[in-house]
């Protein structure tokens, strides 16, 4: 399991590479946020229910429906209009999800060569986009109504992108450069 790998191998390795004197200085993954945006299709309750069901299967916990905060006439949406769902994973569920992401989902993704340094936000967090949520084995292909995308945000307590990249490389996430 990745949590045991982190404690036994990754922490000592990063402590040596980054030159930290204290184990608590070593960066760690704080949480993983998953988001499925439906846009205008969110008004269809059938699509919204399938989105919530699929994200619950992927994450292993019940997602929260997200809605529009302000009305925007150009997009033809009103305040309170459902547009997607999200879920935040921490601790054991987070490590279980990351294990499935690294070893199952990313290798199954079409045209995936690796993650780019440009996907970091400057504070040590990375955002990954999955084009088809059917890459996850938990989702039954016969029961889905529409193939949707999935946004994955991995939040770390690293102070910069370099430290976060080293941490994620130790976990086994592939990087292009």
From Swiss-Prot:
Q: What does this protein do?
A: This is one of the proteins that bind and probably mediate the attachment of the 5S RNA into the large ribosomal subunit, where it forms part of the central protuberance. In the 70S ribosome it contacts protein S13 of the 30S subunit (bridge B1b), connecting the 2 subunits; this bridge is implicated in subunit movement. Contacts the P site tRNA; the 5S rRNA and some of its associated proteins might help stabilize positioning of ribosome-bound tRNAs.
Q: Which GO terms describe its biological process?
A: translation
May I have one GO cellular component term?
ribosome
Give GO MF terms, alphabetically.
Answer: rRNA binding; structural constituent of ribosome; tRNA binding
Say yes or no: keyword rRNA-binding present. yes
**What keywords are annotated for this sequence in UniProt?**
Ribonucleoprotein, Ribosomal protein, RNA-binding, rRNA-binding, tRNA-binding
Pfam families per record = Ribosomal_L5, Ribosomal_L5_C
Query: Which family does the record claim for this protein?
Result: Belongs to the universal ribosomal protein uL5 family.
Name the chain's protein.
Answer: Large ribosomal subunit protein uL5
Assembly with partners or alone? Part of the 50S ribosomal subunit; part of the 5S rRNA/L5/L18/L25 subcomplex. Contacts the 5S rRNA and the P site tRNA. Forms a bridge to the 30S subunit in the 70S ribosome.
Q: Carries keyword Cell membrane? A: no
**What PANTHER family does the entry give?**
60S RIBOSOMAL PROTEIN L11-RELATED (PTHR11994)
